From Swiss-Prot:
Bias kind Basic and acidic residues: ranges: 31-49
Gene Ontology biological process terms from the UniProt entry: post-chaperonin tubulin folding pathway; protein folding; tubulin complex assembly
Functional summary from the UniProt entry: Tubulin-folding protein; involved in the final step of the tubulin folding pathway.
Region (Disordered): 31-52, 138-193, 222-257
Subunit structure: Supercomplex made of cofactors A to E. Cofactors A and D function by capturing and stabilizing tubulin in a quasi-native conformation. Cofactor E binds to the cofactor D-tubulin complex; interaction with cofactor C then causes the release of tubulin polypeptides that are committed to the native state.
UniProt keyword terms in alphabetical order: Coiled coil
Record protein name field: Tubulin-specific chaperone C
Coiled coil: 9-142
Gene Ontology MF term list: tubulin binding
GO cellular component: cytoplasm
Entry annotated with the keyword Phosphoprotein: no
Lineage of the organism: Eukaryota, Amoebozoa, Evosea, Eumycetozoa, Dictyostelia
Residue span, C-CAP/cofactor C-like domain: 216-366
Organism, scientific name: Dictyostelium discoideum (Social amoeba)
PROSITE patterns registered for this protein in UniProt: C_CAP_COFACTOR_C (PS51329)
Amino acid sequence: MSNNNNNNNNNNDEENSKLDIVKKQFQEKEKQRLQSKLEKREISNKEQIDQSSSNIASETLLLINNLSDDIENRLNEISNNTNENKAEDLKESYNQMEESLSEINSITTMSSHILTSYDVKSILENIDNLRKQIDKSKEKYMPKQKLSLTRKKTKTTTVSTKTTSSKEDTNETFNNNNNNNNDNDNTDNNNNKISTEPIFNLINIKGFKNKELFYPPKKEEEIGNQDINNNNNNNNNNNNNNNNNNNNNNNNNNNNNNSNSINDLFISDLTDCTVILDMKVLTALKINNLVNCKIRANSPIDGSIFIDNCINSIFSLVSRQIRIHYCTDCQFNIFVKSNPIIEGSKQIKFSSYLQNLKQQQQQQQQQEQEKVLSSFDNKRFKEYSFDLESNNIDSDKWKLVNDFDWIQQKQSPNWSLVEY
């Protein structure tokens, strides 16, 4: 009886063992089946992702090509309609081209992870080519009006002097011609001296060290054209009443030049200087070769700003577009309508124009030198569609920097943000 029970137990154990084996085999097969299913699903998802990335890359390239074509079409239109181009229309076209170029660079930066290295290289080469075309077109079709007007006035004065002299008797004509020749020699010598001396007038600020300058200058403050103006006045003193009338007209023209209607300004070769721009508006601003300087604009630049080769300087500016080339250790407190662009630059900091202004007012409101800062008037800016105080689509563009030397998706090491 006992033997029978033992046999039954053994049989049960064997059956249970077989069942366990079968169960394990089934579980193993089920695991393999699920693993295979997951692998197939992953492959399918990857194919879909690859296809989606390919579609996105194609759409990105198409968008970039459309923007590039638009820039080229605008350049061709300007070139083909040279006689019909108006200054305001040209300025608007160039501003739109600058914004399109900035958008191309921004799109390329954000999409570099889905574009091939060949595509990225081609796009960057195209950006550089378009930049050169735009600069060349600007140089050709947007001449510097203020400089040409000044030259014409000088020529007019000289002709009028000669005409009056020709009406005098022979002896006086001979004497006056000798005097005029001497005056011309003095003018040439003075011009040679001026070229190496600082300049401060309506179109140029150049060559100063350790100075605080307020722009626009008053007539008596202008440096660089004074000798020429004095020489013209001496010639005019030898003329008759008709020439005195011409002299009055010239003075009226000079007074008009000192009005708030100003075009381009070029600032260059300054060291340890502070420049306060307090004009009504500028159409363009070019800055080059500054060391340890501060530039602040209390009014907008209704166009582009180009800044090159500056070191350890601070800029507080409002404009439609700003391009920064080959600068080191500089801070830009700005409000812009398109993404700032840097190239060949390092240790660059960006902050908000208005936030920086308010911080300085709080820290230095008791110092006399900061009276200029307290003169902030948003109406000046709103007149040219720059609203600094309300929250709008341009409020944060100061921080959306495009670094032409950095095409990776992660943050460029060449610039950083200063927030208050």
